[in-house]
């Protein structure tokens, strides 16, 4: 495969890569009418060596180094915060910088979050819980509603895979709902 189409820092002249599925990441796509299996992949150079600059390989090396240096296991607990961006609704508007663990009708996108959590769990994600967050704000006629999905601790590589799948699921659901999402951590001051 042409690696320059995957990673902007790879030059087209030396961009031959192999994309190899990591079968333990396989999950049934929750959005297709005909069941299909989706799989995360790792990247290898033309000689079959792991691509040094691939994010999953960097994490794998860091994890191994941590274990060798400390003798400890490295687990992570992802907290995926995101904003749903939508046209303001007149009834029960959210208040700026309020809404922590709020419920409907003040939170507009709890259904999207709940659907996302179900799809993430079905794809192998280990979820602790989800809730609305405090970072709500408005600009003109546009509202930004902050939500969070928190994961249970697991080894750092599996935790990263869960977050990759979760972001894809949330973006796909947002497209189905006709809204935008951003995973920017804080977009107001």
Predicted regions and their residues:
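Beta-rich nucleic-acid/ligand-interaction surfaces
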Residues: 84-85, 136-148, 183-189
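ATP/Mg2+-dependent ligation/transfer catalytic cores
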Residues: 1-137, 154-168
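Acidic, glycine-rich loop-and-beta core segments that form the ion-binding/anion-interacting portion
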Residues: 159-189
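Conserved PLP-binding active-site segment of the aspartate aminotransferase-like
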Residues: 149-153
């Amino acid at each position: 495969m042409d690696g320059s189409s995957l990673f902007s820092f790879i030059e087209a002249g030396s961009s031959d890569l192999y994309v190899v599925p990591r079968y333990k990441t396989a999950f049934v796509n929750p959005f297709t009418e005909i069941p299909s299996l989706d799989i995360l992949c790792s990247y290898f150079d033309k000689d079959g060596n792991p691509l040094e600059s691939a994010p999953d390989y960097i994490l794998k090396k860091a994890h191994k180094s941590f274990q060798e240096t400390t003798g400890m296991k490295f687990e992570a607990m992802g907290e995926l915060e995101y904003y749903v961006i939508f046209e303001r609704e007149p009834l029960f508007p959210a208040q700026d910088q309020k809404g922590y663990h709020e419920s409907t009708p003040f939170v507009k996108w709890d259904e999207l979050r709940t659907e996302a959590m179900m799809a993430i769990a079905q794809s192998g994600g280990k979820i602790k819980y989800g809730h609305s967050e405090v970072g709500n704000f408005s600009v003109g006629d546009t509202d930004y509603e902050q939500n969070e999905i928190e994961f249970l601790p697991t080894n750092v590589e599996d935790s990263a895979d869960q977050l990759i799948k979760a972001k894809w699921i949330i973006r796909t659901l947002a497209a189905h709902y006709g809204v935008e999402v951003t995973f920017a951590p804080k977009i107001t001051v």
